Amino acid sequence: MSQERPTFYRQELNKTIWEVPERYQNLSPVGSGAYGSVCAAFDTKTGLRVAVKKLSRPFQSIIHAKRTYRELRLLKHMKHENVIGLLDVFTPARSLEEFNDVYLVTHLMGADLNNIVKCQKLTDDHVQFLIYQILRGLKYIHSADIIHRDLKPSNLAVNEDCELKILDFGLARHTDDEMTGYVATRWYRAPEIMLNWMHYNQTVDIWSVGCIMAELLTGRTLFPGTDHIDQLKLILRLVGTPGADLLKKISSESARNYIQSLTQMPKMNFANVFIGANPLAVDLLEKMLVLDSDKRITAAQALAHAYFAQYHDPDDEPVADPYDQSFESRDLLIDEWKSLTYDEVVSFVPPPLDQEEMES
């Protein structure tokens, strides 16, 4: 929020009271989830169509309060063309004492990758450009020591020019319940996260990119498991059962025993699975969909893969400023998280306006 307090107005939408600065007009509900509801709006100050998210009960518990702080800190830090960033954050409150609501403003993104895949089978050039942008965004995110954890087609926004932004970081760790059954939340998950095999690292996101890329090339979900076990079977049928060196790394004894009880399967020849695909695309998939996360390609390495030769530019694949996540290990009271969040709202400086955006 800027130092001079703007004039706010109130309206009720979908049984929720929205209290927003006058610059945001024509609010119309576009969706709601567990963590808030979202309206599309017109920003009269910039001429941009924006998404305004009102967080739901941001400070109702310590977990909520910490999640609210985490989301604001993350969004404030992200400054990259392929990652959703924060255009504005505001509260109608005039002081910390009356601070209870947080509104986040981001670009309004039209379609997501889900809509795109459903509509058409993509050309190889489209796939190159889309996956290149995901990896370019991931290189930036990973350089700040952040793991997305929940990359899937519905979390990737794409505009008419095929420009892509990564949305919705895995801020809230998914509950077991949300991961159960025939659900997309799980289809793109790396096996080590899905099955709690071990401490995971950033390459969980690379596994997800491999699943997404395979889907763009074929028009079909790669591992549409009906449950955790079915999903693991689909994965192992393609990549083969783990060898002794990987089994040693799985810290969960029950997971080790279960895997050892399965019939040994060799890795399939990816060229026979992705028939007709660009051989370079197949080669990259083989480097992403590796069961052993230590041997999976990184985002930075993948950008330099021959498949992206026409897009790769090492001087235009930036990394992030260091991101201080020491708060993650802190145990604070609700009011302390709330006060930290209030400081972040008040100290927000809007990003410089991009001329191209204003003309579009």
Swiss-Prot record:
Q: Where, by residue number, does ATP bind? A: V30, G31, S32, G33, A34, Y35, G36, S37, V38, K53
Q: Which PANTHER family match?
A: MITOGEN-ACTIVATED PROTEIN KINASE
Description of how activity is regulated: Activated by cell stresses such as DNA damage, heat shock, osmotic shock, anisomycin and sodium arsenite, as well as pro-inflammatory stimuli such as bacterial lipopolysaccharide (LPS) and interleukin-1. Activation occurs through dual phosphorylation of Thr-180 and Tyr-182 by either of two dual specificity kinases, MAP2K3/MKK3 or MAP2K6/MKK6, and potentially also MAP2K4/MKK4, as well as by TAB1-mediated autophosphorylation.
Active-site residues are D150 (proton acceptor)
Short sequence motif TXY: positions: 180-182
Cofactor requirement: Mg(2+)
Q: Which residues carry this modification: Phosphothreonine?
A: T16, T180, T263
Q: Which residues carry this modification: N6-acetyllysine?
A: K53, K152
Phosphotyrosine modified-residue sites: Y182, Y323
The coding gene here is MAPK14
What broad class describes the main subcellular location of this protein? cytoplasm
* InterPro entries according to UniProt: Kinase-like_dom_sf (IPR011009), MAP_kinase (IPR050117), MAP_kinase_CS (IPR003527), MAPK14 (IPR038784), MAPK_p38-like (IPR008352), Prot_kinase_dom (IPR000719), Protein_kinase_ATP_BS (IPR017441)
Report the sequence similarity comment from the record.
Answer: Belongs to the protein kinase superfamily. CMGC Ser/Thr protein kinase family. MAP kinase subfamily.
Q: How is it modified after translation?
A: Dually phosphorylated on Thr-180 and Tyr-182 by the MAP2Ks MAP2K3/MKK3, MAP2K4/MKK4 and MAP2K6/MKK6 in response to inflammatory citokines, environmental stress or growth factors, which activates the enzyme. Dual phosphorylation can also be mediated by TAB1-mediated autophosphorylation. TCR engagement in T-cells also leads to Tyr-323 phosphorylation by ZAP70. Dephosphorylated and inactivated by DUPS1, DUSP10 and DUSP16. PPM1D also mediates dephosphorylation and inactivation of MAPK14. Acetylated at Lys-53 and Lys-152 by KAT2B and EP300. Acetylation at Lys-53 increases the affinity for ATP and enhances kinase activity. Lys-53 and Lys-152 are deacetylated by HDAC3.
Q: What does this protein do?
A: Serine/threonine kinase which acts as an essential component of the MAP kinase signal transduction pathway. MAPK14 is one of the four p38 MAPKs which play an important role in the cascades of cellular responses evoked by extracellular stimuli such as pro-inflammatory cytokines or physical stress leading to direct activation of transcription factors. Accordingly, p38 MAPKs phosphorylate a broad range of proteins and it has been estimated that they may have approximately 200 to 300 substrates each.
- Which parts form a coiled-coil structure per UniProt? none
Organism, scientific name: Canis lupus familiaris
**Reaction catalyzed:** L-seryl-[protein] + ATP = O-phospho-L-seryl-[protein] + ADP + H(+); L-threonyl-[protein] + ATP = O-phospho-L-threonyl-[protein] + ADP + H(+)
Q: How does it assemble?
A: Component of a signaling complex containing at least AKAP13, PKN1, MAPK14, ZAK and MAP2K3. Within this complex, AKAP13 interacts directly with PKN1, which in turn recruits MAPK14, MAP2K3 and ZAK. Binds to a kinase interaction motif within the protein tyrosine phosphatase, PTPRR. This interaction retains MAPK14 in the cytoplasm and prevents nuclear accumulation. Interacts with SPAG9 and GADD45A. Interacts with CDC25B, CDC25C, DUSP1, DUSP10, DUSP16, NP60, SUPT20H and TAB1. Interacts with casein kinase II subunits CSNK2A1 and CSNK2B. Interacts with PPM1D.
Q: Which PROSITE patterns match?
A: MAPK, PROTEIN_KINASE_ATP, PROTEIN_KINASE_DOM
Provide the top EC class. transferase
| GO BP, one annotated term | smooth muscle contraction
Query: How is this protein named in the record?
Result: Mitogen-activated protein kinase 14
Alphabetical UniProt keywords: Acetylation, Apoptosis, ATP-binding, Cytoplasm, Kinase, Nucleotide-binding, Nucleus, Phosphoprotein, Serine/threonine-protein kinase, Stress response, Transcription, Transcription regulation, Transferase, Ubl conjugation
SUPFAM superfamilies referenced in this protein's UniProt entry, alphabetically: Protein kinase-like (PK-like)
